[in-house]
Amino acid sequence: MKAFIVLVALACAAPAFGRTMDRCSLAREMSNLGVPRDQLARWACIAEHESSYRTGVVGPENYNGSNDYGIFQINDYYWCAPPSGRFSYNECGLSCNALLTDDITHSVRCAQKVLSQQGWSAWSTWHYCSGWLPSIDDCF
């Protein structure tokens, strides 16, 4: 009986753990948030390789004890405040949990800040996204 109650509780909580987007839904939402259209295919590629388009992903612990959060796998040592309270530069000025929600606004704004300060190579998956990319024109 306890196992059943736990399963029901987890099933009800599942929507709180983020959502899975696709290339086009991400491109449209980012466009609506003002991201330049010529960047959308590259962002979609990064999201695909970093999180498989999942907003609620917390990556495994990195070599320095940090973790990466959300659809763009943003690092908690530099960019957001981890729930553990561990030191962070928190350059985006937000909790890492804000990067795990269905609303990707915080993730997009923080990712844009990462891009402006470190460029595309800030993402370890960048090499998958540096050449030819599929067009996102069919998404609009």
Swiss-Prot record:
Q: Which Pfam families match?
A: Lys
**A GO BP entry:** defense response to Gram-negative bacterium
> Which residue windows are transmembrane per the record?
none
| Hydrolase as UniProt keyword | yes
Disulfide partners:
C24-C139, C45-C129, C80-C96, C92-C110
Tissue spec? Found in the midgut.
Task: Cite the SUPFAM superfamilies for this sequence.
Answer: Lysozyme-like (SSF53955)
InterPro entries per record: Glyco_hydro_22 (IPR001916), Glyco_hydro_22_CS (IPR019799), Glyco_hydro_22_lys (IPR000974), Lysozyme-like_dom_sf (IPR023346)
- List its EC numbers: 3.2.1.17
Q: Which GO terms describe its molecular function?
A: chitinase activity; lysozyme activity
Which keywords does UniProt give here? Answer: Antimicrobial, Bacteriolytic enzyme, Disulfide bond, Glycosidase, Hydrolase, Signal
Q: What does UniProt list as catalytic?
A: E50, D68
Q: Tell me the CDD domains matching this sequence.
A: LYZ_C_invert (cd16899)
* Superkingdom of source: Eukaryota
Question: Signal peptide: which range, if any?
Answer: 1-18
Please give the GO cellular component terms listed in this UniProt entry. Answer: extracellular space
Stated role: Unlikely to play an active role in the humoral immune defense. May have a function in the digestion of bacteria in the food.
Q: Which family does it belong to?
A: Belongs to the glycosyl hydrolase 22 family.
The name under which this protein is listed is Lysozyme D
What organism is recorded for this protein?
Answer: Drosophila melanogaster (Fruit fly)
